[in-house]
């Protein structure tokens, strides 16, 4: 009998995680999913609810799993919660949990545009998180996705809200290129990365096949809605 791969997923309630868990479950992956808040589990999925990802609650349940997929992160900060707290320090906590649980591989969802030369706070925090993972001694795969699009994705929700207001605000010129990628393609690559050797200790950009400018994407999305496009100087 072939041994089922045992995978731990953090941030189980998020857009990417929900789609990924569904896909992994259909592909006979043994799932352990963790979230701060309650969620509906799939058949044969172990659900863990822990507000602070408490080691005492989690460690025995995830011990000796094959892979941990870390999907917790924020793209917007406030006075109550910031990039350093979630994207950096929390990643450090998750890496420590993985090592204590004797998990050999970690997969991290970073972001397209992350580099050592960035001056943007969000990308800086993601770069720091990547370094924590790369220096952990664990086998790792880091994905840097472009806009991930699909049912109920955050970017689509944002644009729909703006359309209701009859105006979409574009940061800057809008002439910068994007390569949106379907969530259906993303989950397939995540599944492949669980055990294929070509993904070992790699950083991989996840982008769709089509280039278009941000302004073009917004115009296509809002076509036939009589929505005004407004550019915001940065």
PLM regions: where:
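Substrate-positioning beta->alpha
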Residues: 154-155, 172-194, 202
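Flexible, glycine-rich beta-alpha linker
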Residues: 120, 141-160, 176, 212
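A short C-terminal helix-loop "cap" of Rossmann-like NAD(P)-dependent dehydrogenase/epimerase domains
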Residues: 159-172, 232
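N-terminal Rossmann NAD(P)H-binding glycine-rich loop of SDR-like oxidoreductase domains
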Residues: 2-27
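NAD(P)H-binding glycine-rich loop region in Rossmannoid oxidoreductase-like domains
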Residues: 40, 49-101, 112-117
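Mid/C-terminal beta-alpha module of Rossmann-like enzyme folds, strongest
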Residues: 193-234
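Conserved Rossmann-fold NAD(P)-dependent oxidoreductase catalytic core, especially the SDR/UDP-sugar
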Residues: 86-136, 140-146
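Conserved glycine-rich Rossmann-like NAD(P)H-binding loop of the short-chain dehydrogenase/reductase
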Residues: 29-36
């Amino acid at each position: 009998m072939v041994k089922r791969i045992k995978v731990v997923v953090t941030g189980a309630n998020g857009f990417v995680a929900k789609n990924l868990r569904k896909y992994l479950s259909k592909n006979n992956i043994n799932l352990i999913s963790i979230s701060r808040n309650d969620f509906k589990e799939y058949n044969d999925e172990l659900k863990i609810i822990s507000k602070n990802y408490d080691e005492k609650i989690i460690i025995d349940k995830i011990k000796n799993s094959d892979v941990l997929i870390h999907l917790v992160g924020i793209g917007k900060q406030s006075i109550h919660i910031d990039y350093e707290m979630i994207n950096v320090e929390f990643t450090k906590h998750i890496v420590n949990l993985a090592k204590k649980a004797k998990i050999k591989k970690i997969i991290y969802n970073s972001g397209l545009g992350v580099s050592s030369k960035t001056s943007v706070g969000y990308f800086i925090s993601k770069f720091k998180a990547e370094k924590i993972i790369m220096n952990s001694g664990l086998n790792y795969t880091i994905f840097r996705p472009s806009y991930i699009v699909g049912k109920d994705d955050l970017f689509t929700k944002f644009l729909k809200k703006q359309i209701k207001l009859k105006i979409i605000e574009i940061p800057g010129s809008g002439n910068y290129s994007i390569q949106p990628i379907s969530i259906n393609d993303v989950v397939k690559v995540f599944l492949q990365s669980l055990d294929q050797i070509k993904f070992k200790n790699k950083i991989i950009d996840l982008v769709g096949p089509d280039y278009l400018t941000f302004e073009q994407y917004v115009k296509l999305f809002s076509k036939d809605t009589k929505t005004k496009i407004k550019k915001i100087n940065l």
